[in-house]
């Protein structure tokens, strides 16, 4: 299993993904589930959950298309993020079910969160399903989660609004990830973490965080402090 987060605020975007893959108790490995493309007039971040083979095949196809000189559609030639979402969705179908959309898409497909900004356009965030279709998050809840979502979602519901600061959104993403790490052994570190600030056309931060990383530890320690019960006020 896995857990990935994408948050969109008025100030920018935040992404987080764990790195654990689990094919049984005796087959646990670490693979990055984040892909970044920060070139020219566009910044793009993708995170994924689902079938590892399909996810890796999609990422490899994206990289291959970027290197191609034949003028085929790729992340650099897409005109907007909706076309990018459609492009990644078509690759998802291609690698999970070459014969077309069927039940194999559910068994072998992957789910992606993709977001970023093309210069001159607004920042965007999309969820791409195994069947290749896609959606944007609701304006009232501008975030997307995939994978093992039940442990980390409550804090996002409480905190994430369009006007939340990029700093608070980042802290909230780490708290959400930490809640999931502590509750589900199929989700594990290191954590790939990316921050994009609106109209900067480059990633403000891209880190691979371990549990003893200073930035991550500060957030977790603040949680412990907040969770300490307050003593009743004497009458």
Task: Give the residues covered by each predicted segment.
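Contiguous domain-boundary segments centered on the initiation and propagation of an alpha-helix
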Residues: 56-131
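Short beta-strand scaffold segments in enzyme catalytic cores
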Residues: 2-8, 13-15, 110-117, 124-126, ...
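A structural-propensity feature for long, helix-poor, extended segments
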Residues: 35-52, 168, 175-191
């Amino acid at each position: 299993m896995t857990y990935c987060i994408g948050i969109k605020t008025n100030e920018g975007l935040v992404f987080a993904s764990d790195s654990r893959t689990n094919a049984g108790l005796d087959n646990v490995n670490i693979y990055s589930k984040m892909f970044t493309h920060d070139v020219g007039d566009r910044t793009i971040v993708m995170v994924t959950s689902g079938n590892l083979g399909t996810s890796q095949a999609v990422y490899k196809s994206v990289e291959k298309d970027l290197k191609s000189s034949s003028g085929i559609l790729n992340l650099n030639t897409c005109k907007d993020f909706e076309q990018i979402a459609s492009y990644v969705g078509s690759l998802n179908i291609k690698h999970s079910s070459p014969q077309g959309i069927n039940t194999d898409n559910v068994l072998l497909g992957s789910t992606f969160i993709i977001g970023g900004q093309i210069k001159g356009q607004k920042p965007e965030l999309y969820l791409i399903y195994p069947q290749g279709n896609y959606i944007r998050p609701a304006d009232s809840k501008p975030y997307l989660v995939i994978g093992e979502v039940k442990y980390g979602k409550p804090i996002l519901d409480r905190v994430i609004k369009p006007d939340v600061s990029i700093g608070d959104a980042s802290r909230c993403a780490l708290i959400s990830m930490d809640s999931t790490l502590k509750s589900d052994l199929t989700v594990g570190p290191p954590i790939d973490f990316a921050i994009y600030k609106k109209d900067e056309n480059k990633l403000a931060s891209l880190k691979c965080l371990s549990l003893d990383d200073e930035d991550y530890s500060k957030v977790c320690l603040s949680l412990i402090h907040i969770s300490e019960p307050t003593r009743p006020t004497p009458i």
